Amino acid sequence: MQPSGWAAAREAAGRDMLAADLRCSLFASALQSYKRDSVLRPFPASYARGDCKDFEALLADASKLPNLKELLQSSGDNHKRAWDLVSWILSSKVLTIHSAGKAEFEKIQKLTGAPHTPVPAPDFLFEIEYFDPANAKFYETKGERDLIYAFHGSRLENFHSIIHNGLHCHLNKTSLFGEGTYLTSDLSLALIYSPHGHGWQHSLLGPILSCVAVCEVIDHPDVKCQTKKKDSKEIDRRRARIKHSEGGDIPPKYFVVTNNQLLRVKYLLVYSQKPPKRASSQLSWFSSHWFTVMISLYLLLLLIVSVINSSAFQHFWNRAKR
C-alpha cells in the first residue's frame, strides 16, 4: 500500500502538471545554489541528521528524479525515494499553485498599470491560492484599504523560499532608499533583477528559467512610494521617504514595503530561456567538416587539371572540335 502522501502528490501532479513541475524546478534551483543552506528553506526533514543537513544525499536523490510524466506512469515501488521527495515538494498547508492562461497576464497588466514600454509576455503564468488562516489574516490586515499590485524581481534560487516563507523586508539587499522589500509597477525593471538561472534538468518548463513575482500589497502608510495626499495634487512626503534613506525620496514606479504583513505573492511569471536557433542541417554539417570539404575540393580541382592536361584528353578534345 502506498503512503497517503504519494496519492496526494499523484493527484496534484496529474491535475496540474505544470504547477507541480514549477515547484520541482524552484526546489532544484535552491538545492543547486551555493547559498543552498539559506535559500533551501523549508528543507526536507528526512534529510536532516540532527542539526546537520545532508545535502549530498538530497542532491543524489534529486539528480535521479525522472520527469513528472514518466514518474506518473511508473509504479510507486520502482521510484519510492523519488515519490517521497516529490510528495514533500508538493505538500503545503498554507498554499497551492495553479497554472493560469494568457488572459490572466492581460489582467495583471491592468492591475499594475499599462506598461510604458513593450514587455515580454511570460511563457508560463501561475496563480497562488492561500488557505486559511493565512488568507483570512491577510484580509483582516487589509480591512478597508485598497490593494496595490506590483512586480518583484529576484534570482530563481530564491523563489522556493519566497513562495513558502514570503518576502521579508530585513532580508532585502537593496537598501539605497532604506530597508524594505522593493517592488515596481514596471515589469521591465523587475526583469533586470530576475536573471535566468538553472532549474530542474527534466522540467517541462525548460531547464533554464527566470521568475518574477506579482505581489498584492496593502495600501498602508508603511508602504513607501510616490503618492499624492488624499484630495490633493501634492505628494505625500511622509510616504515618499524612509527614515535613514541614502537616496532620498522613493523614485516613481517603485514601492518599498517596510512591514512583512502588508504583502504576499499572488502570481508568478515564468520565462523559459529559448535554445539558440539552429542553422540548417547542411550548414551545421559543413561547419563541423569544413576542413575535410576544402581538402576534398582541392583534390578534385587537382584531378580536373590533371585530366585536362593529359594527352588523351587533348587528343579527344581536338577530335571533338573538328
UniProtKB/Swiss-Prot annotation:
| Domain commentary | The PARP alpha-helical domain (also named HD region) is regulatory, it packs against the catalytic domain.
What this protein is called in its record is Protein mono-ADP-ribosyltransferase PARP16
Q: What is its main location?
A: endoplasmic reticulum
For the protein in the UniProt heading, the enzyme class is: transferase
- In which compartments does the protein localize? Endoplasmic reticulum membrane
* GO CC annotation, single: membrane
Question: Residue positions of the PTM ADP-ribosyl glutamic acid?
Answer: 70
Catalyses which reaction(s): L-aspartyl-[protein] + NAD(+) = 4-O-(ADP-D-ribosyl)-L-aspartyl-[protein] + nicotinamide; L-glutamyl-[protein] + NAD(+) = 5-O-(ADP-D-ribosyl)-L-glutamyl-[protein] + nicotinamide; L-lysyl-[protein] + NAD(+) = N(6)-(ADP-D-ribosyl)-L-lysyl-[protein] + nicotinamide + H(+)
Gene this chain is encoded by: PARP16
The portions of this protein that span the membrane are 288-308
PTM summary from the entry reads: Auto-mono-ADP-ribosylated.
**Origin organism of this chain?**
Homo sapiens
Modified sites of kind ADP-ribosyl aspartic acid: 37
Cross-referenced InterPro entries: ARTD_PARP, PARP16_N, Poly(ADP-ribose)pol_cat_dom
Which function does this protein serve?
Intracellular mono-ADP-ribosyltransferase that plays a role in different processes, such as protein translation and unfolded protein response (UPR), through the mono-ADP-ribosylation of proteins involved in those processes. Acts as an inhibitor of protein translation by catalyzing mono-ADP-ribosylation of ribosomal subunits, such as RPL14 and RPS6, thereby inhibiting polysome assembly and mRNA loading. Mono-ADP-ribosylation of ribosomal subunits is promoted by NMNAT2.
